[in-house]
Curated annotation (Swiss-Prot):
One of its GO terms (molecular function) is proton-transporting ATP synthase activity, rotational mechanism. NCBIfam families: ATPsyn_F1gamma, PRK05621.1-1. It holds the Pfam family ATP-synt. This is ATP synthase gamma chain. Coiled coil: none annotated. CDD domains: F1-ATPase_gamma (cd12151). It is found in: Cell inner membrane. One of its GO terms (cellular component) is proton-transporting ATP synthase complex. Belongs to the ATPase gamma chain family. It comes from Vibrio parahaemolyticus serotype O3:K6 (strain RIMD 2210633). PANTHER family: ATP SYNTHASE GAMMA CHAIN (PTHR11693), ATP SYNTHASE SUBUNIT GAMMA, MITOCHONDRIAL (PTHR11693:SF22). Transmembrane segments: none annotated. Produces ATP from ADP in the presence of a proton gradient across the membrane. The gamma chain is believed to be important in regulating ATPase activity and the flow of protons through the CF(0) complex. Keywords: ATP synthesis, Cell inner membrane, Cell membrane, CF(1), Hydrogen ion transport, Ion transport, Membrane, Transport.
């Protein structure tokens, strides 16, 4: 029965693992709901900021902020959002592939690349790949705040202000639904113009700035970049919890199937052992 005993021990081990994955699935489901609430609460602000900035970029302004000016892209920056923890399927790999593909396109055009990374997974991946990382932040937890991101975003904005960057993008996973997380690249700088003809038609007027356009735009445009990065972080967090819940459910289901297979093997081994013992008993009785 040595073989059967080993199988029984393996069944016990898989059942213990199954309890862990089931618990992680339930925790991820709870965290996903909270993350979705935070994401949905911040989405209207981020989308409104994007619309306003799109209109500003299309307008004939008295003051042309540097963030509105197109320039030759010789140096390109990316703010890449990832998770701090694993066990979330291919979530990080998918967003890294998206970023690497876009980075390679710019490199082929002769552009230099510089990164700011959010999340320990992105830090490990891009540093291992030899990328130039200008700023990094990790350990944001399940409730990230805008203040946690200002430092890294500020580093990239300063580089843009000083002419060390000509383009700035944010890369993150966009939450579509529980089953779908979409790797996304959004241009932050120079400010993308609104491409909606309907919005351009409805809001073809210019803004009136009080008291002066320069201080107002200086503050507004920085706040816009910060809000878009923050939205990317909370979207990515909701994606992380959804992906982890799905991954842990798959692991739990696989454990159930494995236990059934092992129990079948165990029963066959036990039956074979009993049959062998009976054969030995019958053989011994016949000999007597």
């Amino acid at each position: 029965m040595a073989g059967a005993k080993e199988i029984r021990n393996k069944i016990g081990s898989v059942k213990s693992t199954q309890k862990i994955t089931k618990a992680m699935e339930m925790v991820a489901a709870s965290k996903m709901r909270r993350s979705q609430d935070a994401m949905e609460a911040s989405r209207p602000y981020a989308e409104t900021m994007r619309k306003v900035i799109g209109h500003v970029a299309n307008a004939n302004l008295e003051y042309r902020h540097p963030y509105l000016e197109e320039r030759e892209a010789k140096r390109v920056g990316y703010i890449i959002v990832s998770t701090d923890r694993g066990l979330c399927g291919g979530l990080n790999i998918n967003v890294f592939k998206k970023a690497v593909t876009d980075i390679q396109t710019w490199k082929e055009k002769g552009a230099e690349i510089e990164l700011a990374v959010i999340g320990s997974k992105a830090t490990a991946f891009f540093k291992h790949g030899g990328a130039k990382v200008a700023a990094q932040v990790s350990g944001l937890g399940d409730s990230p705040s805008l203040e946690d991101l200002i430092g890294s975003v500020g580093v990239m904005l300063k580089k843009y202000d000083e002419g060390e960057l000509d383009r700035l993008y944010v890369v993150f996973n966009k939450f579509v639904n529980t089953m779908v997380q979409q790797p996304t690249i959004d241009q932050l700088l120079p400010l993308p113009k609104s491409d909606s003809k309907e919005m351009q038609r409805e809001h073809s007027w210019d803004y009136i700035y009080e008291p002066e356009p320069k201080p107002l735009l200086d503050t507004l445009l920085v706040r816009y970049v910060e809000s878009q990065v923050y939205q990317g972080v909370v979207e990515n967090l909701a994606c992380e919890q959804a992906a982890r819940m799905i991954a842990m459910k798959a692991a739990t289901d696989n454990a159930t199937n494995l236990i059934e297979d092992l129990e079948l093997v165990y029963n066959k081994a036990r039956q074979a052992a009993i049959t062998q013992e009976l054969s030995e008993i019958v053989g011994g009785a016949s000999a007597v």
